[in-house]
UniProtKB/Swiss-Prot annotation:
Listed transmembrane segments: none
HAMAP family per record: Ribosomal_uS8_B
Official protein name in the record: Small ribosomal subunit protein uS8
Function: One of the primary rRNA binding proteins, it binds directly to 16S rRNA central domain where it helps coordinate assembly of the platform of the 30S subunit.
Source organism of the structure: Synechococcus sp. (strain CC9605)
Amino acid sequence: MANHDPISDMLTRIRNASEKRHETTKIPASRMTRSIAKVLQQEGFISEISEQGEGIRTELVLALKYSGKHRLPTIRSMQRVSKPGLRIYKNTRGLPKVLGGLGVAIISTSKGVMSDRDARREGVGGEVLCYVY
């Protein structure tokens, strides 16, 4: 079965795994999913990224983070913003602040995929891929 939106698929797999309190989740590897996973790791939403398999069957294995003795997921919500049917672009001044700065917007810029904070620091805008908080 062909996957027409790998970013939405990635977000859904992470969301489902964290709701079920799984330690890890597997997602098909691509340059975009690797970049998004690195941003999630830098922002503290996932603890570890590893690769499994080879060639076209390579998968990313993401170790999810939980907090407290009740193991509450670090990721409360993930929302896809720019979709294949409706792309959303913002300039530097128009970059959103998620939950007043508590969450992260992941932006695809000309300098690579980065968080909204990094994009503001670099002075670049781009496509708003998703919100994570």
